[in-house]
Amino acid sequence: MIKTKPISFCNNIVDNFMDSKDKQFLIDKLYNSYQISITDKDYIIMKDSYFPILKNNLHYVTLMSNGNKYFLYLTTLNDIPICLFIDRKVKDGYNQPRILSVKYDFHLELHKKDTLFGGELIKTNNNKWKFVIYNLYLYCGEDK
C-alpha cells in the first residue's frame, strides 16, 4: 500500500508520496529501465559553434521559463494507472524529490508502457496553473 498525504498543489488537492521506499522504487524504475535520472539537466546553453548544425538540420527549439520543472510520469502501480508529477530538483535537507499523484485522464496504453513528459508548471496572470510540456522522454516505453 502506497503511503500518501493530501496536500494543496496548484490550486488543487493532490496525494503527496510520503514513503521513501515508494519514491525510490519510482526513481529506480526510471533509471534502471530507461537511464533517466531525475536531476539531470535537460538543456544546453547555445554557443556560436552550434549554429551551423542547427542551420543544416531540422530542429525544434523551445524557450524555458522560470517555472517549476517537473516530470509528468504516466505509469502503473499495482496494475492501477497513475499520473505523477516528479519534482526535477531535490530540496535542501531532503534526499529525494517530491512526488505527487494527480488526476489526469490519459489513454490507458500510455500508462501501461510508461510515458514521461518533461515540462514546467507556470502560474498564469489569473492565478491558474499550466503544465507546459517541452520534452517527451518516453512514449509507451520507447525513448524519444
Ranges and model annotations:
Residues 1-113, 118:
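Active-site-proximal "nucleotidyltransferase
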Residues 2-4, 107-144:
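Catalytic nucleotidyltransferase
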